[in-house]
Amino acid sequence: MYSPVESEQGFNFKPELPTSSAYYRLLKKLRRQVGHAIRDFKMIEDGDKVMVCVSGGKDSYTLLDILLQFKRIAPINFDIVAVNLDQKQPGFPEDVLPRYMEENNIPYYILEKDTYTITKRLTPEGKTYCAVCSRLRRGSLYGFAQEIGATKVALGHHRDDIIATFFLNLFHGGSLKAMPPKLLSSDKKNILIRPLAYVEEKDIIKYADLRKFPIIPCNLCGSQENLQRAMLNEMLREWDKQYPKRLHSIFGALQNVSPSQLADRDLFDFEILDSQRELDFKDPEEMKKRLDIVNLSFAAD
């Protein structure tokens, strides 16, 4: 049994593990989905050092928790280190993540960079901070991954994030793209992985609640969520209520692309189709006879 450790904010840094059957069913489901994602996309290999980006939100806590469980039972050896970027947002509880990591014996780093001030300066008035903030955050974390010799950078995006990004690009960006489960960073120095790619957000919410993670709010900066993404997230939630299989089908479509059925000339060579056409009659004379017969039949009609 774990002994609870309380903070001044009321957080429980080392809660007792749930014992309900609902918890174990959910845990089994999450392990299966994360395991399949890791296997399908070869996310983690023997000898890897996986840097898990932890913000203090439900997604990153769940990701870290499941990966730590895999580390204990996996047939391969790999290391996990948690990294949080303290962006110096006003009101950010700086003691929460260090306490949680230490109480649970998790190797971690706290990277301190005042990106909040830079974000405020670079963001036009009336706009949300999210775009600039995420760009600065990515740059800081990816650079730090190189410093500590991480071979993989694990991010907490889940299935619903991937689908929302797909529609965001479709509706507002004029492109068919989402968040890939595995990606080479633009500077080609980091491999990014999303082990929660198959996991639904509603299951993460349930799991985080059952595990009683010390959740840190994501809106401490005072900025509101990007309006377009907020509307898409609401649309997806409504779809999930009314048509439970729809999101599953959409995510399946992202794994079942037919380039020849789209209109991207860089993705498919449409010019080669003429040379690939197979005709039933290779003898020109035979072809002419058949065409004459067809023409006569039209004339008779």
Swiss-Prot record:
CDD domains: TtcA-like. This is tRNA-cytidine(32) 2-sulfurtransferase. Binds 1 [4Fe-4S] cluster per subunit. The cluster is chelated by three Cys residues, the fourth Fe has a free coordination site that may bind a sulfur atom transferred from the persulfide of IscS. Catalyzes the ATP-dependent 2-thiolation of cytidine in position 32 of tRNA, to form 2-thiocytidine (s(2)C32). The sulfur atoms are provided by the cysteine/cysteine desulfurase (IscS) system. One of its GO terms (molecular function) is sulfurtransferase activity. Its EC number is 2.8.1.-. The thiolation reaction likely consists of two steps: a first activation step by ATP to form an adenylated intermediate of the target base of tRNA, and a second nucleophilic substitution step of the sulfur (S) atom supplied by the hydrosulfide attached to the Fe-S cluster. Belongs to the TtcA family. Pathway: tRNA modification. It comes from the Bacteria. [4Fe-4S] cluster binds at C130, C133, C221. It catalyses: cytidine(32) in tRNA + S-sulfanyl-L-cysteinyl-[cysteine desulfurase] + AH2 + ATP = 2-thiocytidine(32) in tRNA + L-cysteinyl-[cysteine desulfurase] + A + AMP + diphosphate + H(+). Homodimer. The keyword RNA-binding applies. The keyword RNA-binding applies. A motif (PP-loop motif) lies at residues 55-60. Keywords: 4Fe-4S, ATP-binding, Cytoplasm, Iron, Iron-sulfur, Magnesium, Metal-binding, Nucleotide-binding, RNA-binding, Transferase, tRNA processing, tRNA-binding. Its cofactor is Mg(2+); [4Fe-4S] cluster. HAMAP family: TtcA. It is an enzyme of class 2 (transferase). NCBIfam families: PRK10696.1. One of its GO terms (biological process) is tRNA thio-modification. It is found in: Cytoplasm.
